[in-house]
UniProtKB/Swiss-Prot annotation:
Protein name from the UniProt record: 2,3,4,5-tetrahydropyridine-2,6-dicarboxylate N-acetyltransferase
Entry keyword annotation includes Calcium: no
Taxonomic placement: Bacteria, Bacillati, Bacillota, Bacilli, Bacillales
E.C. numbers: 2.3.1.89
Pathway(s) where this gene product acts: Amino-acid biosynthesis; L-lysine biosynthesis via DAP pathway; LL-2,6-diaminopimelate from (S)-tetrahydrodipicolinate (acetylase route): step 1/3
GO terms classed as biological process: diaminopimelate biosynthetic process; lysine biosynthetic process via diaminopimelate
Record Gene3D superfamilies: Hexapeptide repeat proteins, Malonyl-CoA ACP transacylase, ACP-binding
An example molecular function term from Gene Ontology annotations: tetrahydrodipicolinate N-acetyltransferase activity
Reaction(s) this enzyme catalyzes, per UniProt: (S)-2,3,4,5-tetrahydrodipicolinate + acetyl-CoA + H2O = L-2-acetamido-6-oxoheptanedioate + CoA
Length: 240
């Protein structure tokens, strides 16, 4: 998996068409209304639903007031530069409510739980779980077979573009409500205890805890048993 360069992300945002997409429920004498090809109109003679850019649909509503009895507009963004990731081809388990922006890479058999937020340029390795309400900022990178606990934050770095993003290596377990600051690398096989604030690199195969996080011990068999990654949670249905 390739991490996006910060300048690539900045260029993408700068050049992207800023959009305000809306869904509009509409009723009236719709046989008298003409809809342009840029607006998706699923309508019959009396009612229907429109999908499109607000700047275009607003004009239709204004110009056809005498034919439109009522309408309701659903809108969840304004001048948005980055669309949501198309999830249909992703070979991972992604639960409802997860917010995943375009240009995120998700490995096979990863798990993204409810209300996780994953920003542009983030990378999630195969078999890793991002738990409920966790946040992966721009360019944050999680290796294979990791667990990022509920409410954890991996800080994002898009500007300044020279800054190093958070890197979590393979087989890492990050507890609930952990904060990992920009530029930190969490080494392979490490465990970060719940609630820790990680300001410095974490050596491989160590346990860190506290605010700021400090090494409290090396990984031992007891720790391995308590932080085991269960592959059963990552299994998908066989492809048809």
């Amino acid at each position: 998996m390739k991490m996006m360069d910060a300048n690539e992300i900045i260029s993408f945002i700068q050049k992207s068409e800023k959009k305000t997409p809306v869904k509009v429920y509409i009723k009236g004498d719709l046989k008298e209304v003409t809809f342009p090809g840029t607006v998706q109109a699923f309508v019959n003679k009396k009612a229907g639903v429109l999908f499109g850019e607000w700047s275009e649909i607003k004009v239709i509503l204004e110009e056809n007031k005498k034919h439109i009895a009522d309408y309701v507009v659903e809108n969840d963004r304004r001048n948005s530069a980055i669309p949501m990731l198309d999830l249909k081809g992703i070979k991972a388990r992604i639960e409802p409510g997860a917010i995943i922006r375009d240009h995120v890479e998700i490995g096979d058999n990863a798990v993204i739980m409810m209300n996780a937020t994953i920003n542009i340029g983030a990378v999630i390795g195969e078999g890793s779980m991002i738990d409920m309400n966790a946040v992966l900022g721009g360019r944050a990178t999680v290796g294979k077979n990791c667990h990022v606990g509920a409410g954890a934050v991996l800080a994002g770095v898009i500007e300044p573009p020279s800054a190093k993003p958070v890197i979590v290596e393979d087989d890492v377990v990050i507890g609930a409500n952990v904060v990992v600051l920009e530029g930190v690398t969490v080494g392979k096989g490490a465990v970060v205890a719940a609630g820790a604030i990680v300001t410095e690199d974490v050596p491989p195969y160590t346990v860190v805890a506290g605010t700021p996080a400090r090494v409290i011990k090396k990984i031992d068999e007891k720790t391995k048993a308590k932080t085991e990654i269960k592959q059963e949670l990552r299994q998908l249905n066989p492809e048809k």
